[in-house]
Amino acid sequence: MEEQGRCACRLEDRPHYEEMVLETMLYSARLKERVARENSAVIVAMSRLMAETFEGGGRVLFCGNGGSAADAQHLATELTIRYRSSVQRPALAAIALSSDSMALTAGANDLGYDAVFARLVEAYGREGDLLVGISTSGNSQSVANAFMAAQERGLKCIALLGGDGGAMKGKADLEIVVPHTGSADRVQECHIAIGHVIIDLVERMLGYCTSSR
């Protein structure tokens, strides 16, 4: 008897796993290429906005849920600690709002989860700061509410979205929508690649990076 939700296929019944690997990774590469070609100017604009935020003494706040929370923490850490060992620079002030489990659980319990990031923006956000919201569907209400709180406080907003952009499309100062639906994984791969390019460009714009790649 098959376990509920488990495919009846077995390892020996599936001789084409290598083709699946190739197909998956080539699709991911093509999707990244499409996003790069369609959004290169936006990525540069995002990088410039972030660099200007740091140069002006501001901070960059990140938020997202699930895998997007992991991306938020990943990128914030690379800004604060280090992106590449070949680049020597001061720490850049970046905060992942998803990293404080006590604040998240207290906010979810006392205010409702959709209000958690907005509350943290109220606590930490100041005019001249920048909020980066990440949502693979574009429908994360907690991130959308954080944008509203940020804009009320004079923060600029960047959105990394997926699918058709969802309810968050058009709500940020700058946005990129990864045109993939049906799963979050390929969108997440593009989001982290975009984030890495932005950090690289920010370091260059601030005069810290001189390497070619």
Curated annotation (Swiss-Prot):
Catalytic activity of the protein: 2 D-sedoheptulose 7-phosphate = D-glycero-alpha-D-manno-heptose 7-phosphate + D-glycero-beta-D-manno-heptose 7-phosphate
Gene3D superfamilies with a match to the protein in the record: Glucose-6-phosphate isomerase like protein, domain 1
InterPro entries: GmhA/DiaA, Phosphoheptose_Isoase, SIS_dom, SIS_dom_sf, SIS_GmhA/DiaA_subfam
EC number: 5.3.1.28
GO terms of molecular function: carbohydrate derivative binding; D-sedoheptulose 7-phosphate isomerase activity; zinc ion binding
Binding site for substrate: N65, G66, G67, E78, N109, D110, S135, T136, S137, S140, Q188
Cofactor(s) recorded in Swiss-Prot or TrEMBL: Zn(2+)
Pathway where this protein functions: Carbohydrate biosynthesis; D-glycero-D-manno-heptose 7-phosphate biosynthesis; D-glycero-alpha-D-manno-heptose 7-phosphate and D-glycero-beta-D-manno-heptose 7-phosphate from sedoheptulose 7-phosphate: step 1/1
This protein's record includes keyword Cell division: no
GO cellular component, one term: cytoplasm
PROSITE patterns, A to Z: SIS
Localization per record: Cytoplasm
Family that this chain belongs to: Belongs to the SIS family. GmhA subfamily.
Further remark: The reaction produces a racemic mixture of D-glycero-alpha-D-manno-heptose 7-phosphate and D-glycero-beta-D-manno-heptose 7-phosphate.
Function field: Catalyzes the isomerization of sedoheptulose 7-phosphate in D-glycero-D-manno-heptose 7-phosphate.
Protein name per UniProt: Phosphoheptose isomerase
